[in-house]
Every structure is written in structure tokens, then in C-alpha cells.
Amino acid sequence: MFIRLAQSNDIPGLIALLRQVGQVHRDIRPDIFRDRCQKYDETALLQLLTDETRPIFVADDQGFVAGYCFCILRSYQNDGAMQDRAELYIDDLCVDENRRGRHIGSALYNHVLSYAREKGCQFVTLNVWQGNDSAMKFYENAGMTPRSITMEAKLC
């Protein structure tokens, strides 16, 4: 297994994993996520694959997409009260449900940390849905800590 940038022939594997993530989110928040949802379709994925600010890394297990990490490079300059900084935002990280427990997620995460350092980023950030306890535990074990918390008041 090795980590590499995604290619167009990885799209079917990416879509299968996006559906797995969509189901996890749907199970946690059916009031927000649609049934059988996926974050990106084939057209969007083709566009993302050409965007150098949005790298997608895959864990390639003998040609099978065993996991992915969608990233967004962000630069903040002259942003009011905040310091200038560069960040890599993890938009989505998923390991195939049948391949979990093999350290694939850690390999992806560590690869992304190295990539972010190479790009001059000071931070790696992400969001986790409340209730996604396994993701919270994974990121906490990887050394991440909360920066901010999004609050909501449900009105209906």
C-alpha cells in the first residue's frame, strides 16, 4: 500500500468511499444529510483533480482505492485581527470500511502532514461532526486539538 495523488481512473473508488462517508454522516444527522448522499459527483471530481490547491491523496492497495484524503490549501493574508498564515484543510478523510484497523488512515494523515509542511503551512485543520466518535478519537490520537466549536440552535 502506498499514498499517491488521485487520478481520473480512481474516480469509481473515490465515489464508493464518498458514499460510505455520506452514510456515516446521514446516520449521525439525518436532519441535515440526504439519504444515499455523496459530497462530490464524477464531474466535480474531474474538476478537483485539476486544481492544484485541492489535492486528493489515495491509499493505493494493489490498485484498489483503500482510502482517500481530500485537502484544500488555504492562505490568509491581511485578515483583520488574525496573523497571516497558510493552512491545509482536510475536507474529507475516509478509509474503506472493510480495510479499517490497518493504519491506512494514519498513513494518509501522516502523508498529508508532510505535504502541508512542504507547502509551508503552519496548521492542518478539519471539522468533525458531533457524534462521529471514531473520527474524533482518531484525530485526538493523532495529536489534533479543538481550535473552535460550531454551535447551533435547532429551530424546527
Predicted regions and their residues:
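A short beta-loop-alpha structural element at the N-terminal edge
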Residues: F2-L17, H25
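Conserved GNAT-fold acetyl-CoA-binding loop/helix
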Residues: G22-L45
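A short helix-loop-beta-strand connector motif used in the catalytic cores of GNAT acetyltransferases and
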Residues: T43-F57, Y89
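Conserved beta-strand in the GNAT
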Residues: V58, F64-L73, Y89, C94
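Conserved acetyl-CoA-binding loop-helix of GNAT-fold acetyltransferases
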Residues: D92-V95, G101-S114, N141
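Conserved active-site alpha-helix within GNAT-family acetyltransferase domains
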Residues: S106, E118, Q130-S148
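Conserved GNAT acetyl-CoA-binding A-motif
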Residues: A116-N127
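Conserved beta-strand-loop-alpha-helix junction that forms the acyl-donor binding cleft
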Residues: T125-A135, E152-C156
